[in-house]
Regions:
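N-terminal lobe/hinge region of extracytoplasmic solute-binding protein
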Residues: 39-89, 120, 127, 189
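Surface-exposed binding/hinge segments that line
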Residues: 86, 97, 132-174
Length: 534
């Protein structure tokens, strides 16, 4: 996300990056050849799908649990725990035919009762889940037999199939339990390809392959997540064999991962991420309640300098809530022009004028705020510095506060104890953004933590869910894109490229529209490689 750059600052940035380059010619020391170790900036918080609101928790719980549906490599919805389904002509009923002989990690059998239990849990108002609205349009869920379940909707619901991609919970293990209790969020039992072996808080999470997985035992024996809170240390761990996979920063990808050594031992990938980075405002704060102020801030930010100076070209400017890869993206919405003069004019119209110290003031109060950034995210921290300088030129003081990710998420964002934040959204392929932007989703733990409210957007978000007509949905979401371009509920900064890197001993890896992890259970390390490393 973020700001501006003078040519001098660009030089300083690149000079500091160059000094940080570390040569490496020694082969990575692989201690567990048939395990994959993944680097993560943050620890998971809760390994239950209903409660997994952060990316670390969601990614790991995705290996432990299955939904009824999932995406294939071409982003087509296919069956997961559901073998097939029938949809009524009016779209108001779905009958799911569930797979047989599916076992939970403790050996119990998966049945339709688990699906009903999951539904009843997610709609329970006492459960602090951000996903309840995905099941709000449901009238009832009925168990027809052990492996058949019927879902009836009150009205058409376009993301219905996708919504059932949420992980199903084990009734026999969680019924009558408080699923928010630390024991249950840290000791999950799923049906997925991997089961939890060990969780050392702040250090690592270890998953073992599930021998009785219904699609066949994964070929990689163990999946390990190591918590490494900064990308520089993580990159060193990658080069010396401490981890096998990480998402590179743009400087790492461009300046450090192009050596013969690196190309010999690692696969590099590059593709547009399906999400964006933004500067978010607490819209309950009176400083940000006037859209002219938000427009003015956006006009003061030079996104191209961020793309060049922070992302090194590995990204594109963001114009709204849908990335260019989305069918909901509106190509007619142009990016807001970087123009400090327009910014100053808008601030004057909103009542903010320069005082004696050269700072913007209103009613004797200077325009000053603090932006929160998560520790270890190099791109966001550098973006914050650029934003600070951009806004300084028009008379705004922006302070930067760096926080550990889980503390930032649960102590500040969930509780709305912030003025502004630099964050990112990784989006679903269906453009239903109800959970992020609808005014009903502002409670603690939900995703509209900036407290955005717009009656037209609320109506459009509901309409987008209620029609199966593709062209109608497209027009609805493109209209939302237009509204956001005017309202600037946040400053949409950039769409970063995903820059993952993986050790070359893993075979069967296929880059696809959905990324590289779609077929992970079939990745393997050839036997001769395992023997060689051992």
């Amino acid at each position: 996300m973020l700001g501006i750059f003078t040519s001098f600052r660009i030089f300083i940035l690149f000079f500091s990056l160059t000094l940080s380059l570390i040569s490496c010619t020694r082969e990575p020391e692989i201690k567990k050849p048939n395990a994959i170790t993944v680097g993560s900036l943050a620890d998971a918080k809760r390994l239950l799908p209903l409660l997994a609101s952060d990316s670390a928790s969601a990614e790991i719980s995705g290996l432990i649990f299955n939904g009824l549906t999932k995406y294939d490599k071409n982003i087509k919805t296919i069956g997961d725990l559901a073998e097939s389904w029938d949809i009524s002509p009016d779209g108001l009923q779905i009958i799911f035919h569930l797979r047989k002989n599916v076992l939970w990690h403790d050996g119990a059998e998966f049945t339709a009762d688990d699906v009903l239990f999951t539904y009843n849990t997610v709609i329970d108002p006492k459960i602090p889940t951000p996903y309840s609205s995905n099941f709000g349009p449901i009238d009832k869920v009925e168990v027809l037999d052990k492996h058949t379940i019927k879902v009836s909707y009150k009205e058409p619901y376009a993301p219905a199939l996708e919504s059932w991609g949420m992980g199903i919970l084990p009734k026999h293990f969680l019924q009558y339990k408080d699923i928010t209790n630390e024991y249950y969020v840290r000791n999950p039992i799923g049906t997925g390809p991997y089961k939890l072996k060990e969780w050392v808080t702040g250090q690592k999470i270890v998953l073992d392959a599930f021998n009785s997985y219904f699609e066949g035992r994964p070929k990689i024996d163990r999946y390990i997540v190591r918590v490494i809170p900064d990308t520089a240390t993580m990159f060193l761990e990658l080069k010396f064999g401490g981890i096998d996979f990480m998402g590179l920063t743009p400087p790492q990808y461009k300046l450090q991962a192009g050596t013969n050594f690196f190309n010999k031992y690692f696969h590099k990938f590059r593709y547009p991420s399906f999400g964006y980075t933004y500067l978010g405002y607490n819209l309950k704060d009176t400083k940000f309640s006037d859209k002219r102020v938000r427009q003015a801030i956006t006009h003061a930010i030079n996104k191209k300098d961020i793309i060049t100076g922070v992302m090194l070209g590995y990204g594109t400017p963001c114009t709204g809530p849908f990335p260019p890869e989305s069918w909901a993206y509106n190509p007619d919405v142009k990016d807001i022009e970087y123009n400090p003069e327009i910014s100053r004019k808008l601030f004057r119209e909103a009542g903010w004028v320069k005082g004696q110290r050269g700072l913007l003031e209103k009613d004797g109060r200077a325009f000053e705020f603090t932006v929160l950034v998560n520790q270890g995210n190099e791109a966001r921290m550098k973006t914050a510095q650029i934003l600070k300088e951009n806004l300084k030129t028009i008379g705004i003081t922006m302070n930067i506060k760096v926080l550990e990710w889980q503390a930032m998420l649960h102590e500040f964002i969930d509780k709305k104890r912030f003025e502004a934040i630099i964050m990112g959204w990784a989006l679903s392929r269906d453009p239903d953004i109800f959970d992020i932007w609808h005014s009903s989703k502002t409670k603690e733990g939900e995703f509209n933590f900036i407290s955005y409210r717009n009656d037209e957007v609320d109506t459009l978000l509901l309409e987008g869910r209620r029609t199966f007509d593709f062209e109608k949905r497209k027009k609805i979401y493109q209209r939302i894109h237009e509204i956001f371009a005017d309202e600037q509920p946040c400053t949409f900064l950039y769409v970063p490229d995903a820059l993952p890197v993986l050790h070359k001993r893993f075979k069967g890896v296929e880059k696809a529209p959905i990324g590289i992890w779609h077929d992970f259970i079939h990745w393997q390390v050839p036997k001769n490689k395992i023997e060689w490393y051992n």
